[in-house]
Amino acid sequence: QDAKKFNKVVLDYALPAALFVSIAQANRKMLAEDLKLSIISLVVLMLCFMIVYFVFRYCFKKNTQADAAVSALISGSPTIGFLGFAVLEPIFGTNAYVALVVAIVGIVVNAVGIPVGLALLNAGNAKAAGKKESPWKPVIHALEQPVAWAPILAVIWVVVGIPFPKWLAPSFDLIKGANASLAVFSAGITLSAVVIKINWQAILGSILKLVMMPAMILVAGLIFKMEPENLKMLVVAAALPPAFSGIIIADEYDTYVATGTTSLTLSVILFMGFCPLWLWITDACCKAFL
């Protein structure tokens, strides 16, 4: 019950506000500056998201559509909002390109991934309840939730070219700072309430997140000749542990909580080894093929 109270605060207030201000403070020039980076991020990350969804939907007979949707929100999404700067800046330094990668991956994960995941989740719950609804109803229901429409509104804000009011920044930055703490704390409460049991689904989720996603980004970046430094940052961003927001959504909907939290815990531990490994692999590939 305590976790659910925190989840509601995070999903309805803190996270939407944080997502909005993070994206709205970007600009069209930033998105267009490296169009190749933007397109590869969108296509590959969402392809990985849907691969995770279909793998968990059809390879495990006991899984429902809602289970698969939550698994995609967890193992198909890097936790860029919480760990993006914390991981990338110590490795690559504080510069505009780090901010660019974090902003673009954040837009893909939050403005595309979360609404798609919630739509699949709502459709699965409606199907399980035996309701025959319009295929658009789950999408509309997902978009009614602040955590889905706030990042989409922010993207529209950026594309239209409206400058973010400087006088609003301090208030939103305060909420953004509180969101990171609340979200991690809420995810921690959820983790503490669940007995961690390693199973094949948790292991597969970690493999898909830590191996498949960065590997596909690396291959796409090499094929389309991305700038080496940007490619390294994008690969590390893709290798980040699963999104904490996925765990919060799982707990809020009472769906796939145990396996999802186990996969998150396993991925966080394994990331300590996979991060330097992917840096070495990407560096070697860039020297060989770019």
Describe each PLM feature range.
Residues 1-290:
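Alpha-helical transmembrane segments of multi-pass small-molecule/ion transporters
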